[in-house]
Swiss-Prot record:
Gene3D superfamilies (alphabetical): Helix hairpin bin, Tubulin/FtsZ, C-terminal domain, Tubulin/FtsZ, GTPase domain
Keywords: Acetylation, Cytoplasm, Cytoskeleton, GTP-binding, Hydrolase, Magnesium, Metal-binding, Microtubule, Nucleotide-binding
Main subcellular location: cytoplasm
Name of the protein in its database record: Tubulin alpha-2 chain
Residues modified as N6-acetyllysine: K40
UniProt-listed Pfam families: Tubulin, Tubulin_C
Catalytic activity entry: GTP + H2O = GDP + phosphate + H(+)
Cofactor: Mg(2+)
PANTHER family in the record: TUBULIN
Residue positions of the active site: E254
């Protein structure tokens, strides 16, 4: 078996995690108490869903997941929520005082008290696996726990499980909407370690997802629940091929191989289609070509950056539902002819496709319509650099005045760590610029842009 362990860190990680596990359970027909009526073999570890769930002797299915937060309120919602019986109490780890939006607290003072306990729980889950494939890490880099404890855990995982792949689903600060003043600091410090310790990171950004909910689902005032349900569809589509049998299955290491041209260039954009409300879906025929085109629309991207400003290096299309390879090939061929979708010239093929016959599931009472087929796109585009340059700019404005720095230094950080992290990100922006320009002397003098 190729098992995956999910690690949910901080408020964002946990709430996205809740949405994901709710969806997984619905997809597999697992009840909130962990029973699965359709599974006839008790304790049989050979079903595809065992990559994400372990099975007890009593026939209960337990998620291979750990939830960690430095303060209890968010985890208490899991402990009292609809799926409280699904998780083993030891999988829910909470501390007493939170990181107070401070990377240094999450990474040094308070985080280090809880990190050994987390690793211990993760070790128990890993011992339960016959062939651990890797980790899915969910966090946000704007707060204190997601950024600080998140990086600390990633660093320790690299030491303990060197070769296992780590896929990050990371919520980045939005251009306009901000949840804390020191977001730029936390993000830069955290990205510095994400660069080294994750193999693929999928960037998500609340503002972009708000806009998708508003525009495509006609939700006037989207809540985090609306956002997370949309994100969970993306993550479910990515992991569907690990959990179901399909025609073209994709495994976690395959993402890495196909999407990451250079180790540092591993920050991905994601999009999902069709995002459509039930009222509209009734009147629309969503063909493979249509959903593929809409997945490439700049407005479908789940991070605020415009892929038209950069070039694609690679792109992974995960279809699910009623899709045959012939339609996929036709859709991809038509994408390649579009002038607006540009690939770097050193990557001529650029597409990796997966097909899974399990149609997308929707959460009852959710916002998305039940559709026959859907596609999730994960792409590596040089336009991601916009996300970093935006954060770097905000970081520079604050750091020039050394604003708020004393909170970090007071928790045992050194000022040098700030400049080191900032230089690392400057190098990353430079890397992206070079990758986009690294072409042979191209036609139409495209090199003049830089």
């Amino acid at each position: 078996m190729r098992e995956c362990i999910s690690i949910h860190i901080g408020q964002a990680g946990i709430q996205v995690g809740n949405a994901c596990w709710e969806l997984y359970c619905l997809e597999h027909g697992i009840q909130p108490d962990g029973q699965m009526p359709s599974d006839k073999t008790v304790g049989g570890g050979d079903d595809a869903f065992n990559t994400f769930f372990s099975e007890t002797g009593a026939g209960k299915h337990v998620p291979r997941a750990v939830f960690v937060d430095l303060e209890p309120t968010v985890i208490d919602e899991v402990r009292t929520g609809a799926y409280r019986q699904l998780f083993h109490p030891e999988q829910l780890i909470s501390g007493k005082e939170d990181a107070a939006n401070n990377f240094a607290r999450g990474h040094y003072t308070i985080g280090k008290e809880i990190v050994d306990l987390c690793l211990d729980r993760i070790r128990k889950l890993a011992d339960n696996c016959t062939g651990l494939q890797g980790f899915l890490v969910f966090n946000a880099v704007g707060g204190g726990t997601g950024s600080g404890l998140g990086s600390l855990l990633l660093e320790r995982l690299s030491v303990d499980y060197g070769k296992k792949s780590k896929l990050g689903f990371t919520v980045y600060p939005s251009p306009q909407v901000s949840t804390s003043v020191v977001e730029p600091y936390n993000s830069v410090l955290s990205t510095h370690s994400l660069l080294e310790h994750t193999d693929v990171a999928v960037l998500l950004d609340n503002e972009a997802i708000y806009d998708i909910c508003r525009r495509s689902l006609d939700i006037e005032r989207p809540t985090y629940t609306n956002l997370n349900r949309l994100v969970s569809q993306v993550i479910s589509s990515l992991t569907a091929s690990l959990r179901f049998d399909g025609a073209l299955n994709v495994d976690v290491t395959e993402f890495q191989t196909n999407l990451v041209p250079y180790p540092r260039i591993h920050f991905m954009l994601s999009s999902y289609a069709p995002v459509i409300s039930a009222e509209k879906a009734y009147h629309e025929q969503l063909s493979v070509a249509e959903i593929t085109n809409s997945a490439f629309e700049p407005s479908s991207m789940m991070a605020k950056c415009d892929p038209r400003h950069g070039k694609y290096m690679a792109c992974c299309l995960m279809y699910r539902g009623d899709v045959v390879p012939k339609d996929v090939n036709a859709a991809v061929a038509s994408i390649k002819t579009k002038r607006t979708i540009q690939f770097v010239d050193w990557c001529p093929t650029g597409f990796k496709c997966g097909i899974n016959y399990q149609p997308p599931t929707v959460v009852p009472g959710g916002d998305l319509a039940k559709v026959q087929r859907a596609v999730c796109m994960i792409s590596n585009s040089t336009s991601v650099a916009e996300v970093f340059s935006r954060i770097d700019h905000k970081f520079d404005l604050m750091y020039a005045k050394r604003a708020f720095i004393h909170w970090y230094v007071g928790e045992g950080m050194e000022e040098g760590e700030f400049s080191e992290a900032r230089e690392d990100l400057a190098a990353l922006e430079k890397d992206y610029e070079e990758v986009g320009a690294e072409s042979a002397e191209g036609d139409e003098g495209e090199d003049d842009e830089y």
